[in-house]
Amino acid sequence: MDAFTPETIWNEYEELLEMTRRHSFSSRIRKYRDLSILRLLGEVSLVVACDSNASNGEKPNDTHRNTYDETAVSALKVPTMEVLATGATPIVIADNLCVEMEPSGRKIISAMQEELDRCGLLDSI
């Protein structure tokens, strides 16, 4: 790893700004299926993973009938494990639930928080 100097940090910052203006991050992004790794500064990267869990839950028309606890763990585990597999530390979970907040969304979020706590990740997110 190269040593950071004010000049190298400034140069990389300028490069990121220019890429933002051009909407061209391709030289700094590596993609693996639904996992994206954006190199920020030096060897510091932002790792983003996503997954979908559609039609999974307790609603009458859900094709995969599961409790909200099972749905929460299912939605949480794949992207979290993908981020952990890169050696990164999860810092943000976006749940993107497509259900009403009460009672379904609240139950799923609560179950996700319990699972993160059980795994020792709740305090870092």
Question: What is the role of each PLM region?
Answer:
Residues 1-2, 69:
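Compositionally biased, intrinsically disordered low-complexity regions enriched
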